[in-house]
């Protein structure tokens, strides 16, 4: 039986396990070993039985009609911004300027304020467009942020850190992708920023263990 993911619900199949993210309820659901009876292609679900389809609809994870949310599209992270920046000659590295300090402080305050809102309200609107390859200007502004970051009075888990950096980079005119991903056995959820195939705030080698479930 053909179904569609409900509005605000995202999913990924990892081996034989299906993981759902319900954005409105800020909750993950894992259905282990269901891969043989449940297929996923984009936002289209294929259930092998009417009973399974009805259970997914009753749980709010699936719907009998499609919605306008775009299907997940993203590149796997192949490069790490940190490594690229550290390979630059000292004369090529960017020292923070006043605009970097102002941008970072404003981003930190905005991210602290965002913590008071529900998870769904912290996310930008969904878009099928992906960020382009990291430009030299983006890398220079990221390099400046990495230099001043130890002095900022802000810290937190990956959601806060990636949101802070996203606010900072977008405030300086850059487009980035906010990747939300999961792994199983053991289950873990993680998020990071990416431009093209470059991870901006994490190590690409570490991120290959995660499977993207949502991109904003």
Where are these regions (language model features)?
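Long, charge-rich, low-complexity alpha-helical segments
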Residues: 17, 25-112, 121-125, 172
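Secondary-structure boundary elements
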Residues: 87-157, 161-170, 194-195, 199-201, ...
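Short strand-coil-strand connectors
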Residues: 23-25, 196
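Long, low-complexity, charged/polar intrinsically disordered regions in eukaryotic proteins
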Residues: 1-16
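A short, glycine/Asx- and small/polar-enriched loop/turn
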Residues: 186-190
């Amino acid at each position: 039986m053909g179904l569609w993911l409900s509005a605000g619900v995202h999913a990924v199949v990892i081996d034989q396990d299906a993981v759902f993210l319900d954005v409105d309820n800020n909750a993950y659901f894992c259905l282990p070993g269901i891969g043989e009876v449940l297929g996923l292609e984009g936002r289209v679900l294929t259930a092998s039985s009417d009973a399974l389809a009805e259970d997914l609809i009753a749980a709010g994870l699936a719907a009998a009609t499609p919605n306008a949310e775009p299907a997940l599209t993203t590149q796997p992270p192949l490069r790490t911004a940190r490594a690229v920046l550290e390979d630059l000659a000292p004369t090529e590295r960017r020292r923070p300027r006043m605009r970097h300090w102002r941008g970072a402080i404003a981003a930190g305050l905005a991210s602290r304020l965002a913590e008071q809102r529900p998870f769904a309200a912290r996310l930008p609107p969904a878009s099928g467009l992906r960020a382009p390859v990291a430009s030299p200007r983006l890398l220079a502004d990221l390099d400046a942020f990495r230099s001043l970051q130890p002095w900022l009075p802000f810290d937190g888990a990956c959601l806060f850190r990636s949101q802070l950096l996203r606010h900072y980079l977008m405030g300086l005119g850059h487009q980035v992708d906010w990747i939300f991903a999961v792994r199983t056995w053991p289950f873990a959820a993680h998020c990071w920023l990416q431009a093209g195939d470059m991870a901006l705030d994490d190590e690409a080698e570490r991120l290959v263990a995660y499977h993207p479930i949502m991109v904003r």
